[in-house]
Design a protein with these regions (language model features):
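A conserved alpha-helical element in kinase catalytic cores
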Residues: 5-56, 73, 78-82
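A cross-family kinase active-site recognition segment
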Residues: 41, 74-130, 154
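A glycine-centered beta->alpha junction motif in the catalytic cores
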Residues: 43, 55, 59-73, 116-124
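Catalytic activation segment of kinase domains across protein kinase-like and atypical kinase folds
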Residues: 165-200
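Activation segment
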Residues: 8, 67, 184, 192-194, ...
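Glycine-rich ATP phosphate-binding loop
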Residues: 2
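An alpha-helical support segment within catalytic cores of ATP-dependent transferases
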Residues: 99-100, 116-159, 169-181
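Active-site activation/catalytic loop segments of kinase-like enzymes and analogous catalytic loops
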Residues: 197-231
Length: 234
């Protein structure tokens, strides 16, 4: 089990969104793929406890999903990266049928807020070369991507498919000679938000490229799997 203690500043509606999304995905994907909420004796999913300073904290317990984080799985074969894309594409298709009143609109990690975040914090980058690079790509995003944003699909997105949140397991557990791996789960829904659906893929691509000798090729494998499951039209 995983026992989660939320920040005292956390909004209840955000936790409700996380659990509603998990319930939705659990129904669409089947039992055992996603963490499930455990209820208290009073049948509550979320309850409150007092901290050492009498501050009230929301707590909950989730089932534990077995798997190895992608960051600890080597190598990242083309098959595995494509499987990651397929998994995310299936999730994006599922989220087309999911809505919630909470959208985490103000979340700093919401892709909607990217340009504002860059404008607000770029001055704090002390390395002038890196600062110029961020300004360049921030400007390019606004001039090239900005005009087409109104035409892009929007949905709830997990928004954090980094290599610590993607869990991997054997694709053929009953075959001891097989080295094939597959994605079995995506954990940590803390950054879930309503934004551009393509952001789901963008986050995964960024992390898939890290430390790769051929980063563009690694990203392409993720895109291939995603597109096969959830065709891109952007």
């Amino acid at each position: 089990y995983v026992f989660k203690i939320s920040s005292a500043a956390e909004k209840r509606s955000i936790l409700d969104l996380q659990h509603a999304a998990l319930d939705h995905l659990g129904t669409e994907f089947g039992d055992g793929v996603w963490p499930c909420a455990c209820r208290t004796r009073n049948r509550k999913i979320i309850t409150r406890i007092n901290g050492p300073d009498d501050t009230r904290y929301m707590v909950r317990m989730l089932t534990y999903v077995t798997g190895t984080p992608l960051v600890d799985t080597k190598p990242h074969s083309p098959q595995l990266l494509q499987n990651l894309g397929t998994f995310l594409g299936r999730m994006s298709r599922s989220f087309e049928r999911f809505t919630h009143t909470e959208t985490q609109k103000e979340l700093i990690w919401n892709p909607d807020n990217g340009p504002d975040v860059i404008h607000t914090y770029v001055e704090h980058i002390t390395d002038h070369k890196k600062q110029s690079m961020v300004e360049y790509y921030g400007s390019a995003y606004e001039s090239v991507v900005g005009p087409v944003l109104p035409t892009m699909r929007r949905s709830i997105i997990h928004n954090d498919a980094n290599d610590h949140n993607v869990l991997i397991a054997d694709a053929e557990p009953d075959n001891p000679t097989s080295w094939r791996k597959q994605v079995v789960c995506l954990i940590d829904f803390g950054d879930i938000a309503r934004s551009y659906t393509i952001g789901e893929l963008a986050v995964a691509m960024a992390y898939a490229m890290l430390g790769k000798a051929e980063p563009i090729s690694a990203a392409a494998h993720v895109v291939k799997g995603y597109h096969a499951e959830y065709p891109l039209n952007e």
